[in-house]
Every structure is written in C-alpha cells, then in structure tokens.
Amino acid sequence: MNITEMIEAIKSGKKARRACWNGDKFLYYVPAASYIAMTDVAKSIMDESGKVKYKEYIAIHCKDGEVDFYTAPQCDLFANDWQTI
C-alpha cells in the first residue's frame, strides 16, 4: 500500500510498517487530546482544567522500545511497500 492508504489504516486503529523495516518498529495514530500540565512551561499554556491540548500525530514505536514522533523521509513518502501488522 502507499502512504495515503497507510495513513487511513492507522487512523482506523491499525499498526503499520514498511516491508524493509526490521525489529518491532511500527507506526500508529495518536488522536488529538490533552494532558495534565506538569512543567512550568506547560502550566503557562494550560487551559482552565489544567490541561494542555495537542493535535493528532503519527507516532513511531522504535526498535529500542521507545516511542517518538514520526516525520516521513522522502523514501517513505513514495514507498509502496507499507503493510498493516
């Protein structure tokens, strides 16, 4: 599948990866929500309920088990080997 199809798949709750990725590396969708302000900076921008709103994003579960924001490189944008897992 291409990247557009992959985005639709993860927005429906699936995990996705490139066929060439190894280990436990995959992408998933994180919907917009909010979190409790913990730092002074976050507290300076929190809403009335003490939370900071964030926008939807794609997260990547890395081989080391940690999660990060995903920004697609050129090779991923034009790939046709995306698959759901």
Model regions and ranges:
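Short, compact, well-ordered microdomains
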Residues: Y54-I85
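Extended non-catalytic interaction/regulatory regions in multidomain proteins
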Residues: M1-C62
